């Protein structure tokens, strides 16, 4: 592969890592600081904090695994190490995806307006809905790990019986199995986020029709709340789509012999979601936006001194 392209992608990955660590670190520090001071943090801030911490761990894991792959490719390709690393990666990746999806569900129930009795029933029991979502994500995570590890155990047994060819078969099948399983289970939270976005758009459309003859101020307040949430969800879904497509590309890249460039592209695409999305959340959250402005003004004053 062209050395210039490789260096370019590595630089992009490094920038994404720095942006992601600072963005997610900022979210975590702001909320943990309030918690230490004895202030009560809201449900959305609790989700944001859990999301930020899981993404910090995920970004560090991406960086470490990538450098191990580049510097020690032979050691990286041993079946047991591949399995352990992918299991750890799946843990933080699934946590990140489901916390982001929980955030979409939270915004949907807080802002959307429907007269449907099921919606109203769930809206007044939002805390239970969020707990149920996290329990479901835990069940799906366990299934994901089982599906990834079961074929590996079979392949290792085959390797012990016939050492002549099973190692190649092992690595090839494992390289296809992990991204396929993560793509399959990653589609579920993506689909849930997409549904909440579509329903929120429909809610805004219904609201605008219903409030045409209502007071202008009330209409503007609710419409602005819908639009702010939709702006955040649009940016989130765009990054989510790139992330999901990168998993599809990784499944396809497992079939190729010369795949270094494609692996770099998919890695850059995958890292964009936990990295850039943190700043989307900061700009879309009033508390985080205010805190970031305070930090910016403080840094500006320090620079002038």
Curated annotation (Swiss-Prot):
Cited CDD domains: 7tm_TAS2R14-like
Protein name stated in the entry: Taste receptor type 2 member 116
Lineage of origin: Eukaryota, Metazoa, Chordata, Craniata, Vertebrata
GO-annotated molecular function: bitter taste receptor activity; G protein-coupled receptor activity
Subcellular location: Membrane
Gene3D superfamilies (alphabetical): Rhodopsin 7-helix transmembrane proteins
The species this protein was found in: Mus musculus
Chain's role: Putative taste receptor which may play a role in the perception of bitterness.
Cytoplasmic side: 30-55, 123-128, 206-236, 283-305
Glycosylation sites: 93, 160, 170
Anything else known: Several bitter taste receptors are expressed in a single taste receptor cell.
Pfam families xrefs: TAS2R
InterPro entries to which the protein is assigned, alphabetical: GPCR_Rhodpsn_7TM, TAS2R
Extracellular side: 1-8, 77-101, 150-184, 258-261
Keyword Cell wall biogenesis/degradation: no
UniProt GO cellular component terms: membrane
Main location: membrane
Source superkingdom: Eukaryota
Membrane topology, from the record: Multi-pass membrane protein
């Amino acid at each position: 592969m062209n050395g210039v392209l490789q260096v370019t992608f590595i630089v992009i990955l490094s920038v994404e890592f720095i942006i992601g660590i600072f963005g997610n670190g900022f979210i975590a520090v702001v909320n943990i600081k309030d918690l230490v001071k004895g202030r009560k943090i809201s449900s959305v801030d609790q989700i944001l904090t859990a999301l930020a911490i899981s993404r910090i761990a995920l970004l560090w894991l991406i960086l470490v695994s990538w450098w191990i792959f580049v510097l020690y490719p032979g050691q990286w390709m041993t079946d047991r190490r591949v399995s352990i690393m992918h299991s750890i990666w799946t843990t933080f990746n699934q946590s990140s995806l489901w916390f982001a999806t929980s955030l979409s569900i939270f915004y949907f129930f807080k802002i959307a307006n429907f007269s449907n009795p099921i919606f109203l029933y769930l809206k007044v029991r939002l805390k239970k809905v969020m707990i149920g979502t996290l329990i479901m994500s835990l069940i799906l995570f366990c299934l994901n790990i089982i599906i990834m590890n079961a074929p590996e155990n079979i392949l290792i047994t085959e390797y012990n019986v016939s050492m002549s060819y099973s190692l190649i078969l092992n690595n090839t099948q494992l390289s296809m199995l992990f991204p396929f399983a993560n793509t399959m289970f990653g589609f579920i939270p993506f689909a849930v986020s997409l549904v909440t976005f579509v329903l929120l758009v429909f809610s805004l459309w219904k609201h605008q029709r219903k409030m045409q003859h209502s007071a202008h101020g009330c209409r503007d307040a609710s419409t602005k709340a819908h639009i702010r949430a939709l702006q955040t969800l649009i940016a989130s879904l765009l990054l989510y789509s790139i992330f999901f497509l990168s998993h599809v590309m990784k499944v396809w890249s497992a079939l190729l012999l010369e795949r270094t460039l494609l692996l770099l592209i998919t890695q850059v695409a995958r890292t964009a979601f936990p990295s850039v999305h943190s700043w989307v959340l900061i700009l879309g959250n009033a508390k985080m936006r205010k805190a970031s402005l305070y930090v910016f003004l403080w840094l500006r004053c320090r620079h002038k001194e």
